[in-house]
């Protein structure tokens, strides 16, 4: 389970999933999860965004589900947003995946597009 980084901002914490072939990706461990939860606990209104790479790719579904589950177990009132590049058809194809079911029931999934220049 690899991730890119955790970024602490004044009003939210960003969890960056690893993109395929990301050479800077790191192994995710319990210390990283603890750091993420500590950072969220310091916010008066905790907000977690999960983005970069593709949080809903086959490689990242388990990790995305794990992070959301553990954050909500410790800080139940956390608002969680998952940003994805997947289109509606691709999202629909995930509906039978148990990790996706958990993710979609515990967070807001926000599709976004990369605009070509």
Ranges and model annotations:
Residues 3-81, 86-98:
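Conserved Radical SAM active-site core
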